[in-house]
Regions:
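Flexible "arm" and connector segments at domain edges
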Residues: 1-94
Length: 94
């Protein structure tokens, strides 16, 4: 996994990293807005989300986080989200 992210880094270069991540955030944001307005396009939403996640992981690697740290934190967040979903946390009116 780390090798794949390093390839992405080499492809985009240091100067373009920020611009590429911002572009991917905008594409994900557009896809989220489309989901609310037009209904979900699961494939596009997944693709844009994964693009953003992979670039964020690249930044974490660049700043010295190792794979275990990142995966441990992701697992913690996923477990919390699943727990909240199963216990109706997201069903509450805000």
């Amino acid at each position: 996994m780390k090798e794949d992210l390093l390839e992405i880094f080499k492809h985009f270069g240091v100067r373009n990293q920020r611009d590429k991540l911002c572009e991917e955030f905008r594409e994900l944001q557009d896809e989220i807005f489309c989901t609310f307005e037009l209904g979900i396009d699961r494939e596009n939403l997944l693709n844009e989300g994964v693009d953003v996640i992979s670039l964020i992981l690249q930044f974490l690697f660049d700043y010295g986080y190792d794979t275990k740290e990142i995966i441990d934190e992701l697992q913690t967040r996923i477990k919390r989200t699943v727990f909240r979903k199963n216990n109706g946390y997201y069903d509450k009116k805000i």
